[in-house]
Amino acid sequence: MKINEVTDCIINSAMEVHSAVGPGLLEKAYNVCLAYELSVRNLHFERQVRLPVTYHGIRLDPGFRVDYIVENCVLVEIKAVEKVHPVHLAQLLSYLKLSGLPVGLLINFNVVHLREGIRRRVNNYRSEDESDPRRPPRPLR
């Protein structure tokens, strides 16, 4: 499945969740519902994936956790906030940089129309070798 197809499936899954339960719930509720929708669509995903930081050749664990990695190519961060702030987008970009994944989605469920709560970002930090679309992303663990 191509990256755009994966992101479309994730967005459609999120829209299904949002249309069923609406805005106003806690982030954890949306996480559980989205996991169900992704599994119904037979998408491979991991939840709460730890992201290490390599510092002077040493892998350190600062406690960063990504909400979802879907089909090993799309990073997904879930929010249920009144407004998406620059710090939320910076978090997404940092996670993309650390993971080496090509695309990230930030989905804020606390909006009337979900399309207004979706932000898609491309990882501009990938090395030339990693930017080859035929090369799988580096493993996270």
Specify the residue positions occupied by each region the protein language model found:
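N-terminal, polar/charged subdomain of small-to-medium soluble alpha/beta proteins
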Residues: 32, 63, 69-70, 125
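Conserved catalytic cores of phosphodiester-cleaving nucleases, focusing on short active-site segments
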Residues: 22, 66-84, 95
